[in-house]
């Protein structure tokens, strides 16, 4: 058989409610003393640990960004320096090429002037030698003409003979 006070919802009494509230309050106090504070301590530790990990990660990221910026700067500077070196080398090569061309032109002009000078000197020497030979030939012919009283034909033959001998001497 069922007893009426054991059936749920059969009767509401303030004593039962008060006892339930009192037991609940004691349970809350015990939970707060023995479980809540240690649980909150663990939670606080966890929060601080996570916060320090986040700070460390942000610091690492900031350092990485700074290093990346520095590396980009160094790379850009290296590019600029290499470009400058290339330009300097091109300019130096161009100057050397121009200097070589100028030197070659001066040398060719000098050789050309020497050749002209040699040609002129040889020409003068040849003319001088020819004048001497013509002069001595004229004297020789004149002496032969004086020795022999020649007519025009003999005189022409004599001149031709001396000219041929002169050509053979060379």
Swiss-Prot record:
GO terms for molecular function: proton-transporting ATP synthase activity, rotational mechanism; proton-transporting ATPase activity, rotational mechanism. Pfam families: ATP-synt_B (PF00430). InterPro entries: ATP_synth_B-like_membr_sf (IPR028987), ATP_synth_b/b'su_bac/chlpt (IPR002146), ATP_synth_F0_bsu_bac (IPR005864), ATP_synthase_B_chain (IPR050059). The chain crosses the membrane at residues 11-31. One of its GO terms (cellular component) is proton-transporting ATP synthase complex. It is a single-pass membrane protein. The keyword Calcium does not apply. Keywords: ATP synthesis, Cell membrane, CF(0), Hydrogen ion transport, Ion transport, Membrane, Transmembrane, Transmembrane helix, Transport. The keyword Membrane applies. It is found in: Cell membrane. Gene3D superfamilies: F1F0 ATP synthase subunit B, membrane domain. F-type ATPases have 2 components, F(1) - the catalytic core - and F(0) - the membrane proton channel. F(1) has five subunits: alpha(3), beta(3), gamma(1), delta(1), epsilon(1). F(0) has three main subunits: a(1), b(2) and c(10-14). The alpha and beta chains form an alternating ring which encloses part of the gamma chain. F(1) is attached to F(0) by a central stalk formed by the gamma and epsilon chains, while a peripheral stalk is formed by the delta and b chains. Belongs to the ATPase B chain family. F(1)F(0) ATP synthase produces ATP from ADP in the presence of a proton or sodium gradient. F-type ATPases consist of two structural domains, F(1) containing the extramembraneous catalytic core and F(0) containing the membrane proton channel, linked together by a central stalk and a peripheral stalk. During catalysis, ATP synthesis in the catalytic domain of F(1) is coupled via a rotary mechanism of the central stalk subunits to proton translocation. PANTHER family: ATP SYNTHASE SUBUNIT B, ATP SYNTHASE SUBUNIT B', CHLOROPLASTIC. This is ATP synthase subunit b. It comes from Listeria monocytogenes serotype 4b (strain F2365).
């Amino acid at each position: 058989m069922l007893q009426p006070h054991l059936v749920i919802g059969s009767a509401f009494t303030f004593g039962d409610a008060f006892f339930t509230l009192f037991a609940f309050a004691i349970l809350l106090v015990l939970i707060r003393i023995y479980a809540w504070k240690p649980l909150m301590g663990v939670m606080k530790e966890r929060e601080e640990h996570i916060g320090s990990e986040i700070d460390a990660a942000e610091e690492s990221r900031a350092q990485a960004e700074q290093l990346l910026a520095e590396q980009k700067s160094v790379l850009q500077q290296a590019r600029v320096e290499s470009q400058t070196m290339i330009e300097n080398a091109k300019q130096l090569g161009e100057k050397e090429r121009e200097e070589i061309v100028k030197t070659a032109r001066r040398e060719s002009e000098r050789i050309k002037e020497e050749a002209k000078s040699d040609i002129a000197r040889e020409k003068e020497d040849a003319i001088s030698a020819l004048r001497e030979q013509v002069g001595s030939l004229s004297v020789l012919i004149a002496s032969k003409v004086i020795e022999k009283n020649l007519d025009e034909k003999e005189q022409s033959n004599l001149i031709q003979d001396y000219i041929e001998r002169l050509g053979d001497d060379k």
